[in-house]
Amino acid sequence: MAYIAKSFYDLSAIGLDGEKIDFNTFRGRAVLIENVASLUGTTTRDYNQLNELQCRFPRRLVVLGFPCNQFGHQENCQNEEILNSLKYVRPGGGYQPTFSLTQKCDVNGQNEHPVFAYLKDKLPYPYDDPFSLMTDPKLIIWSPVRRSDVSWNFEKFLIGPEGEPFRRYSRSFQTINIEPDIKRLLKVAI
């Protein structure tokens, strides 16, 4: 089992640029973490909505995308290919993320990233779909399998400005619909 951090601010990740992303720098801001894939059926929608949320809250929200290839092999690019895939293939049309992307990682199983070990420990299932499971067990390519596992691409975790995991959302919950919860956490008029 992966080490589970004591605090959200003890965590870090490595960006696509190879630089360390220290979560301690996120104090006082809400953070939206989403496992992403560039070849999923909802890639265009979700990536565009992530950009939109980051643009709506440029100083008070941090959006982090964690590319993952564990669901249908839908992020099969190498780290150095991901941005070009997004720009020219899907979403395409010159798309550029306005948020940070990390290097590819596992979100489930023995090699799960410590960020996801922590978040799944604190938020073991999506609030909008507490019975959410992988729809096709033949697609499970990791071990061990746990009830709290992320079930597909574009599952989301919202963390409050004090570092407390607030809510987990299923893959079917549209990213843009998280905005009222972001406003609530930031105490912005809805």
Curated annotation (Swiss-Prot):
GO cellular component, one term: cytosol
Active site location: U40
Keyword Disulfide bond (UniProt): no
Biological processes, Gene Ontology terms: biological process involved in interaction with symbiont; negative regulation of inflammatory response to antigenic stimulus; response to oxidative stress; response to symbiotic bacterium; temperature homeostasis
EC category name: oxidoreductase
Localization: Cytoplasm, Cytosol
Superkingdom: Eukaryota
One GO molecular-function entry: glutathione peroxidase activity
CDD domains on file: GSH_Peroxidase (cd00340)
EC number: 1.11.1.9, 1.11.1.12
Chief place of localization: cytoplasm
Coiled coil: none
Chloroplast found in the keyword field: no
Catalytic activity line of the entry: 2 glutathione + H2O2 = glutathione disulfide + 2 H2O; a hydroperoxy polyunsaturated fatty acid + 2 glutathione = a hydroxy polyunsaturated fatty acid + glutathione disulfide + H2O; tert-butyl hydroperoxide + 2 glutathione = tert-butanol + glutathione disulfide + H2O; cumene hydroperoxide + 2 glutathione = 2-phenylpropan-2-ol + glutathione disulfide + H2O
InterPro entries per record: Glutathione_peroxidase (IPR000889), GPX_AS (IPR029759), GPX_CS (IPR029760), Thioredoxin-like_sf (IPR036249)
Keywords from the UniProt entry: Cytoplasm, Oxidoreductase, Peroxidase, Selenocysteine
Biological role stated in the UniProt entry: Catalyzes the reduction of hydroperoxides in a glutathione-dependent manner thus regulating cellular redox homeostasis. Can reduce small soluble hydroperoxides such as H2O2, cumene hydroperoxide and tert-butyl hydroperoxide, as well as several fatty acid-derived hydroperoxides. Cannot reduce phosphatidycholine hydroperoxide.
Assembly description: Homotetramer.
PANTHER family: GLUTATHIONE PEROXIDASE, GLUTATHIONE PEROXIDASE 2
Family as reported in the entry's similarity comment: Belongs to the glutathione peroxidase family.
Protein name: Glutathione peroxidase 2
Native source organism of the sequence: Mus musculus
Name of the gene encoding the protein in the UniProt record: Gpx2
